[in-house]
Swiss-Prot record:
Positions annotated to bind GTP 2: 185-192, 232-236, 297-300
Extent of the signal sequence: none
GO molecular function: GTP binding; ribosome binding
Full protein name: GTPase Der
InterPro entries: G_ENGA, GTP-bd, GTPase_Der, KH_dom-like, KH_dom-like_a/b, P-loop_NTPase, Small_GTP-bd
Length: 446
């Protein structure tokens, strides 16, 4: 998945541009309820090119007192991890020394960079925009993120730089019947230790210093006749940076790994608990409808007081309640205790993720579900009616339900249907998707 990062000085309009690009293309991101909207990355599609767009401001916080340092860090991060850079400057303030410095850094990159000058909403700003040619750039895109001016020219050109044909299908074929698994989690949570344990030999360097593993490599293993590909086994860190920065950086890599996975193992630290970043990754897993297992590592070091354990688990379920389908496992990658449960669980989750249900069974379940709890009235006082349903896809199991007023279905009724389908089809450990369609008339008679 191509990652496009928006970079620029504070207050130039990065977030506004991010919102415009992601909002105008919300088809792909909006069809899943209950996922947090408060975030700085989005999967969008422009001219049929899917990509992930990231507002880097979110990675460095709002501490403007140290903004030069922060901005530099942000640029380096984006240069490292993104595929395309989108530089934004502010025509209202005009050319700023910081812009020149950033442009300099970007010019040294081998990645495509698009330079936009924002806040072009009047003739005065247009004059200011000309100043930016002093940066020695071939092409500058005058835009107004707030009003939409110039956005399509910019995005059309940017999308042309995104490679055709996502590698997804090729990769799918290549991996045959293998289950693609990624192990994600913040630095020091024990990813390398776990991978080494699974591989049965210390192939990945483990160290108590965060960020000691480098290159992205996939590892193949066969257990009990099932092949697994551990994606990006080297993990999601960088050498020689502070822990705090590392945690901010890792999200881009994490998102890319989610894209490539069937099943994501989200590792948490039993001692440190759940962080916002864990929830961010979890939100993305949900949004991308990937199967997931929550692995609580370092269980050997956890406080075994039953009350605390209960509080930990309650808190976990509460914070991951949008991901109820993810089984939770506790283990210790260090001692190996209970790690043996992981791959069988991955296999079971994957089985459900690929499950097919015949149309007859789907419709029987639909009938029973409706009989048990009638659909509420649609807004226009007409009765909401479901006609029939059928499974249209796997990974995840996806069901299309034909009804008279798809737009009138309340979220709570959708949740009810989802839960009943899960129960009826034994799909408790996989995401499933329900799509509501207006009934299509066939044949052209009557
Ligand atoms: N006039 C005008 N104002 C804009 C435009 N785009 C953004 N702004 C304003 O510029 C200000 C900063 O916008 P943000 O999108 O928050 O900028 P940012 O670069 O994300 O800022 P940081 O998060 O501080 O780095 C806001 O008050 C926006 O309303 C535009 O096209 N025209
Ligand atoms: N007590 C305990 N320590 C563990 C366990 N798993 C890993 N550790 C320790 O945690 C530290 C970090 O482990 P790593 O496997 O390097 O963690 P990582 O997630 O790969 O870390 P980064 O390279 O920073 O991303 C090491 O000192 C491990 O020995 C566990 O199950 N129990």
């Amino acid at each position: 998945m191509t990652v496009v990062a928006i970079v620029g000085r504070p207050n130039v309009g990065k977030s506004t541009l991010f919102n415009r690009i992601s909002k105008d293309n919300s088809a792909l991101v909006d069809d899943l309820p209950g996922v947090t909207r408060d975030r700085n990355y989005a999967r969008v599609s422009w001219n049929d090119k899917p990509f992930v767009i990231i507002d880097t401001a979110g990675f460095v916080g709002q501490d403007t007192s140290a903004f030069e340092e922060l901005t530099r860090e942000q640029i380096l991060l984006a240069l490292d991890e993104a595929d395309i850079l989108l530089f934004v400057a502010d025509a209202k303030t005009g050319l700023h020394p910081g812009d020149a410095e950033l442009a300099d850094l970007l010019r040294r990159s081998s990645k495509p960079v698009f330079y936009a000058v924002n806040k072009i909403d009047g003739s005065e700003q247009r004059r200011h925009a000309a100043e930016f040619f002093e940066l020695g750039l071939d092409r500058i895109y005058p835009i107004s993120a707030a009003h939409g001016f110039g956005i399509s020219e910019l995005m059309d050109d940017l999308c042309a730089a995104i490679p055709e044909a996502p590698a997804q299908t090729a990769e799918e074929e290549e991996s045959g019947g293998a289950i693609r698994v990624s192990i994600l989690g913040r630095p020091n949570v024990g990813k390398s230790t776990l991978v080494n344990h699974l591989l049965g030999a210390p192939r990945v360097i483990v160290s108590p210093v965060p960020g000691t593993t480098r290159d992205a490599v996939d590892s193949h293993i066969v257990k009990a006749g099932q092949e697994y590909v551990l994606i990006d086994t080297a993990g999601i860190r960088r050498k020689g940076r502070t822990r705090e920065k590392l945690e901010k950086i890792s999200i881009i890599k994490a998102l890319q790994s989610v894209e490539r996975s069937h099943v994501v193992v989200l590792l948490l630290d039993a001692v440190e608990g759940v962080t916002d970043q864990d929830l961010h990754i979890a939100g993305y897993i949900k949004e991308r409808s990937r199967a997931c297992i929550v692995g609580i590592n370092k269980w050997d070091a956890a406080d075994k007081d039953p009350k605390r354990t209960k509080r930990f688990m309650d808190d976990l379920h509460d914070r991951f309640r949008f991901l109820t389908y993810a089984p939770v496992l506790t283990f210790s990658a260090l001692t190996g205790r209970n790690v043996a449960r992981l791959l069988p669980t991955v296999k079971e989750v994957f089985r459900q993720y690929n499950q097919r249900v015949t149309t007859g069974i789907v419709n029987r379940a639909l009938e029973e579900t409706l009989a048990r709890h009638e659909p509420p009235q649609a807004g226009n006082r007409r009765r909401l009616k479901f006609y029939y349903a059928t499974q249209t896809a796997v990974r995840p199991p996806t069901f299309v339900l034909f009804c008279n007023y798809p737009q009138a279905i309340h979220f709570s009724y959708e949740r009810y249907l989802t839960n009943r389908f899960r129960e009826a089809f034994g799909l408790d450990k996989t995401p499933i998707r329900l799509i509501f369609r207006p009934r299509q008339r066939t044949g052209g008679t009557s």
